[in-house]
Structure formats: structure tokens, C-alpha cells
From Swiss-Prot:
<keyword id="KW-0143">Chaperone</keyword>
<dbReference type="InterPro" id="IPR003495">
    <property type="entry name" value="CobW/HypB/UreG_nucleotide-bd"/>
</dbReference>
<comment type="similarity">
    <text>Belongs to the SIMIBI class G3E GTPase family. UreG subfamily.</text>
</comment>
<dbReference type="InterPro" id="IPR027417">
    <property type="entry name" value="P-loop_NTPase"/>
</dbReference>
<comment type="function">
    <text>Facilitates the functional incorporation of the urease nickel metallocenter. This process requires GTP hydrolysis, probably effectuated by UreG.</text>
</comment>
<protein>
    <recommendedName>
        <fullName>Urease accessory protein UreG</fullName>
    </recommendedName>
</protein>
<feature type="binding site">
    <location>
        <begin position="11"/>
        <end position="18"/>
    </location>
    <ligand>
        <name>GTP</name>
    </ligand>
</feature>
<dbReference type="GO" id="GO:0043419">
    <property type="term" value="P:urea catabolic process"/>
</dbReference>
<dbReference type="Pfam" id="PF02492">
    <property type="entry name" value="cobW"/>
</dbReference>
<dbReference type="GO" id="GO:0003924">
    <property type="term" value="F:GTPase activity"/>
</dbReference>
<comment type="subunit">
    <text>Homodimer. UreD, UreF and UreG form a complex that acts as a GTP-hydrolysis-dependent molecular chaperone, activating the urease apoprotein by helping to assemble the nickel containing metallocenter of UreC. The UreE protein probably delivers the nickel.</text>
</comment>
<keyword id="KW-0547">Nucleotide-binding</keyword>
<keyword id="KW-0963">Cytoplasm</keyword>
<dbReference type="GO" id="GO:0005525">
    <property type="term" value="F:GTP binding"/>
</dbReference>
<keyword id="KW-0342">GTP-binding</keyword>
<dbReference type="GO" id="GO:0016151">
    <property type="term" value="F:nickel cation binding"/>
</dbReference>
<dbReference type="GO" id="GO:0005737">
    <property type="term" value="C:cytoplasm"/>
</dbReference>
Length: 205
């Protein structure tokens, strides 16, 4: 098995994908060799955000402009992303982890197995507590489901208990977690999930 792990990060617009990647990079970059590919339709805003936040060195972040449906670029024709990932892997030969962040998409989004090894799907509480029971591949089949922005639950009238109940029903025994990127709550759970997936796990503490 190769030493690097390709991790797809998907979810609707505004769910907090980039913020979670930022947190993970900041927490893990001293222990793991990391790179990121971001997807936007017409800009490279997510790549710029990660660069400006100093989550990683600029040369480890590559922005891809898909120019169309974000789902197509990660599933039906993922060549533009595959090339970007391979360029980073060629440039940094000791990579442990490559994040591929999709453009904001709907609940039907999923990554091609040719592009990533595992998929983390992110939804947020602000979209309402009905989201988990709506289903879709991201909810039911992702390797890890993240329910982000739990700090907004009271503000938007969402019940975390309902979201937990429906998530357990939809995902059976598949892992999931609540997160708050402002406080860092739940981020360690994602790190632990990655720890169990990365061959170079000895670098984790």
C-alpha cells in the first residue's frame, strides 16, 4: 500500500469544508506531510483562503477551476483533479495525506474511487435538523459524516438530538461526529479517523 492517503472532502456550499481542512492542516502539519487540492467553479477562493490562513505552505495548496458542475469534476470526469493530485505527489514525494476538497454540491455528490481512498462528507446544522434523514450517498455511504456548526443549533432552531437520532438511523454502524471549527470541538475525532487510515500512523501522537 502506498504511504499516502487521498481523502475527499465533500458537502454543500457553506458547510465548512475549507474551515475543517484548515483546522486539520494546522493540527497535523507538524506530524504529517500534507497537501491540498481545492475545487471552485470559476475562482480559486478556497485555495486562497487556506494560503492566507497559513494552514500550509502555498506550494502545498493547488486550486482547480472546474468551470462547470462540481460533481462532474470529482466523479464522472475527475481527470483535472487526478492530474493536480499527481503533480503534488510528484513534487512532494514523502506525502502522507492529500485532501481533495470538492466544490459545494448537493447530497448526491460522491467521489470517484479512482480519485480518493476515503470520503469525508460535511453538512452543517444551519441547514436544518432534517438534513440527515434526507439521505443521499454523502449521508449514508461516506466513510465519515461530519455535522458541523453545532454552535448555531439554538440560533436556527435545530435539534442536535434529532440530528443524532436520524444520523444513527441512516448510517447504521458507519462513523460520524459533531464539530465546531470555532472551538475545535470534534476535530480530534476526525484526526483519529485519519490516524486509523494512514499507513504512516506512527507519526501521529
Amino acid at each position: 500500500m502506498e504511504s499516502k492517503l487521498r481523502v475527499g472532502i465533500a458537502g454543500p456550499v457553506g458547510s465548512g469544508k475549507t474551515a475543517i481542512i484548515q483546522r486539520l492542516c494546522e493540527n497535523l502539519k507538524d506530524r504529517l506531510e500534507i497537501a491540498v487540492v481545492t475545487n471552485d467553479i470559476y475562482t480559486q477562493e478556497d485555495a486562497k483562503f487556506l494560503t492566507n490562513s497559513k494552514a500550509l505552505a502555498p506550494e502545498r495548496i493547488k486550486g482547480v477551476e472546474t468551470g462547470g458542475c462540481p460533481h462532474t469534476a470529482i466523479r464522472e470526469d475527475c481527470s483535472i483533479n487526478r492530474i493536480a493530485v499527481e503533480e503534488l505527489e510528484h513534487k512532494f514525494t514523502t506525502l502522507d495525506l492529500v485532501f481533495v476538497e470538492s466544490g459545494g454540491d448537493n447530497l448526491a455528490a460522491s467521489f470517484s474511487p479512482e480519485l480518493v481512498d476515503v470520503c469525508i462528507y460535511i453538512i452543517d446544522v444551519a441547514a436544518g435538523d432534517k438534513i440527515p434523514r434526507k439521505g443521499g450517498p454523502g449521508i449514508t455511504r461516506s466513510d465519515l459524516l461530519v455535522i458541523n456548526k453545532i454552535d448555531l443549533a439554538e440560533m436556527v432552531g435545530a435539534s442536535l438530538k434529532i440530528m443524532e437520532r436520524d444520523t444513527l438511523l441512516m448510517r447504521k454502524n458507519l462513523p460520524w461526529c459533531f464539530t465546531n471549527t470555532k472551538t475545535g470541538e470534534g476535530i480530534k475525532i476526525i484526526e483519529g479517523f485519519l490516524c486509523n487510515q494512514i499507513p504512516s500512523v506512527h507519526k501521529m501522537v
